[in-house]
């Protein structure tokens, strides 16, 4: 969690492993969720900077629907203000927001059980950023490894104050609705530690108001982009969920492989080939070693055909549902308006508690 950073990213081949059990399954936390799902509130989300892709699908989106269906209160944030943390303008914001809504609904996010909202529609959330900034030091923000990585890949010529304070804004996202469970990839865990620090320090200074959110670490395998680097919405190296079957075939055909014609699953020695094998295995819910063995000496061309067929078959029902929702954008946008109303009510109640706890703000 992001809540708000891309939820499925890759940092290298060593992270790729065979398909695992559902995120966090078998842990004490997962057992508590199963026993009493109604006691948990999840805050998660995606920045509207481009279409969601296969990395998001396997890395976080399926888990959101799973948690919703268990009975967890799932709140999905579209952090439109945070688009400008690492770029100077928010391009195509309305288009990308509509796209996220279509993806969420087509994937199974149910507006009757889950909430979707935007930053810009919830003033109380953003106001919480001010007292929260007093609870962390500049040195602590500078040391955050996720911020360092984002700064390194920023599109801006200079680091903005919004970029540096990004983890605190994320704390406001989570704590505005009293979120107590945040699904994150391992590369996002430092952000959640800032949220926990803010909650703990506020409670110590002003009295107990906030829960310290628990981390639900994703164990979902990580997929490389088609160029063999970190998969990203902004790097043109992903396969969007909304792509057509032909577009998917073209993107996968251009994926980086290697010169060895014999296909094997070896993430450390053959990261690019292994990522394609893994993607096939995830789509088919099979073991990647078996998938690789079946392709054998077929080479990269056979591998890419297999991947393309698996992806298009897996996403066909999603794409059909998405196309139906796209025919009624009035309804789709009404889902966001209703979510904004609920998020406003939650954030305003939290802000009232913060003001009361701080005493001087009446």
Which residue stretches match the model-derived regions?
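Classical nucleotidyltransferase
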Residues: 127-130, 143-206, 210-225, 233, ...
